């Protein structure tokens, strides 16, 4: 499992529903012992860090078209900050909730109108399934309504992409956006949160993360919110905008240290080590 909470709920279900004996994290069956453990998945930290560093060194001729557009918006509105939202278009990701929470934020704090832009990437998922087609229509309508409600001659509140993007463009987004707003209703881990932090090589930027994401258990320095509480999301956005750079650096350095230490290689090593240990215990169990 990704987190201890998931592991604990599974063991509780096995004990209460199936009535099997559970000792700490082991389930005793007539012919074997099943060991349950949690392994929070990491990322290839060095890959994202290196890509971000190379991105900052690139010349204007080497920049992607997306980066040029991002730079154009930054130059046109230098005081405006960009909020990043990246997800598969899936019910569990809470995209519609996030857009409504952003609308609530602009309604509650109108002083941020023209000073913020939500850069939202929704990656197509199960687009042939009617329920997902309905979700896409809902998201399209919400984006259109909010852009129509708040847009000015020189500013649009939501910049919306519905497509997959190559790795280089993801780095463009990670490095250009001041805030990452990731508010899934339920998510096993959410590696985007970790990738965003890994690319912040100057240690600035603020991560706002749903408490429903598995990554929240490892990333306490982020602003952890309930995605269903619009007032809490709005307050977190305001806090992120007003957070001093020194505090951003302090939080991100702690996050980066942890993510670097427990990357995808360490995750795989720990998993295989536990698997090998379980195999040895199984052989011992059979010999009894």
Predicted features by range, described:
Residues 1-288:
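Catalytic cores of carbohydrate-active enzymes across secretory and cytosolic contexts
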């Amino acid at each position: 499992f990704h987190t201890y909470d998931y592991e604990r709920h599974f063991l509780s279900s096995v004990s209460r529903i199936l009535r099997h004996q559970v000792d700490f994290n082991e389930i005793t069956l007539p012919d074997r012992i099943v060991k349950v453990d949690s392994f929070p998945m990491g990322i290839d930290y060095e890959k994202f860090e290196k890509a971000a560093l190379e991105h900052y060194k690139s010349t204007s001729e080497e920049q992607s078209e997306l980066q040029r557009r991002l730079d154009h918006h930054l130059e046109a509105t230098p005081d405006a900050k960009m909020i990043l939202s990246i997800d598969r278009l899936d019910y569990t990701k809470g995209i519609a909730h996030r857009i409504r929470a952003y609308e609530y934020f602009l309604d509650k704090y109108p002083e941020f109108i023209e000073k913020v832009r939500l850069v939202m990437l929704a990656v197509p998922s199960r687009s042939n399934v009617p329920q997902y087609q309905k979700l896409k229509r809902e998201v399209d309508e919400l984006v259109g309504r909010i852009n129509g409600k708040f847009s000015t001659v020189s500013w649009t509140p939501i910049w919306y992409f519905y497509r997959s993007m190559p790795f280089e463009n993801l780095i463009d987004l990670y490095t250009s956006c001041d805030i990452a707003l990731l508010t899934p209703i339920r998510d096993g881990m959410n590696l985007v949160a970790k990738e965003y932090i890994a690319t912040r090589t100057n240690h600035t930027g603020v991560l706002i993360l749903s408490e429903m994401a598995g990554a929240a258990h490892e990333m306490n320095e982020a602003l952890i919110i309930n995605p269903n509480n619009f007032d809490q999301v709005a307050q977190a956005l305001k806090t992120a905008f007003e957070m001093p750079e020194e505090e951003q650096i302090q939080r991100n350095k702690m996050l980066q240290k942890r993510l670097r230490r427990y990357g995808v290689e360490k995750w795989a090593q720990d998993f295989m080590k536990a698997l090998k240990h379980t195999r040895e215990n199984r052989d011992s169990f059979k010999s009894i």
